[in-house]
């Protein structure tokens, strides 16, 4: 199974920790966080790993190498300019277009059953399934409203306090059909939550939710460490 790990961000909210390293290399329990993530994915059977690179990419390559120490095969894809989340995955299209693939952020720290997530997508009729989790304060994340069939009816990226209509926050993890590449412009800055998902819903495509159970965090800000 294939997974695309997005590692191109500069981690500005984590400065000064990211002046000398990219976010995925911030240490957790004496190891770069990306090593914990790849080990978890490998244990679940995601052995074909595509990593999008931008800021301080050499450090990520040094942390993972060819992936053999973690039981995976790693392919690196570099961004020449900032492409956003969906744009960075589009840049790696040729490595991902054969089958549905998992997308995760390189700063994620999880013990979630992402294999269950992947299988749930294979069994539904959506172009993309979005991992959601219930949290107390969703203002730093995208939020979604779902119906009884787990179909996403509304999605809002980083709502202000007056715009909150749900406590189901996007984990930033998705399972996508290769068809999504038809809706992402090449070489342009384009985000999943801000651009792609609203456009797909406007065009009438079905987006489904998977409700995560377990521990999920990221190293995106100091309070998350």
PLM region descriptions:
Residues 2, 47-49, 73, 127-128, ...:
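Residues at the starts of beta-strands that form the adenosine-phosphate
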Residues 61-62, 66-148, 183-185:
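Conserved beta-loop-beta/alpha segment of the NTase-like Rossmann-fold superfamily
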Residues 33-36, 88-91, 196:
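Well-ordered alpha-helical segments embedded in enzymatic catalytic cores
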Residues 46, 100-102, 109, 115-122, ...:
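Catalytic-core segments of class I nucleotidyltransferases/pyrophosphorylases
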Residues 5, 51, 103, 128-131, ...:
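Structural beta-sheet core signal
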């Amino acid at each position: 199974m294939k997974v695309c790990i997005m590692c191109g961000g500069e981690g500005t909210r984590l400065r000064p920790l990211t002046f000398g390293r990219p976010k995925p290399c911030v240490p957790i329990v004496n190891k770069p966080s990306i090593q914990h993530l790849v080990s978890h994915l490998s244990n679940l059977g995601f052995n074909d790993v595509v990593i999008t690179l931008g800021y301080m990419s050499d450090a990520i390559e040094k942390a993972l190498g060819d992936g053999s120490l973690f039981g995976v095969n790693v392919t690196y894809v570099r961004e020449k300019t900032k492409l956003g989340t969906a744009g960075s995955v589009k840049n790696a299209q040729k490595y991902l277009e054969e089958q549905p693939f998992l997308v995760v952020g390189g700063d994620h720290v999880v013990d979630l059953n992402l294999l269950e997530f992947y299988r749930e997508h294979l069994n539904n009729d959506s172009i993309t399934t979005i991992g959601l989790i219930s949290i107390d304060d969703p203002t730093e994340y995208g939020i979604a409203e779902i119906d009884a069939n787990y179909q996403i009816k509304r999605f809002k990226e980083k709502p202000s306090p007056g715009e909150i209509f749900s406590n189901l926050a996007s984990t930033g993890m998705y399972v996508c059909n290769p068809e999504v590449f038809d809706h992402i412009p090449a070489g342009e800055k384009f985000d999943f939550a801000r651009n792609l998902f609203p456009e797909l819903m406007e065009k009438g495509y079905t987006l489904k939710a998977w409700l995560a159970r377990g521990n999920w965090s990221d190293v995106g800000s100091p309070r998350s460490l």
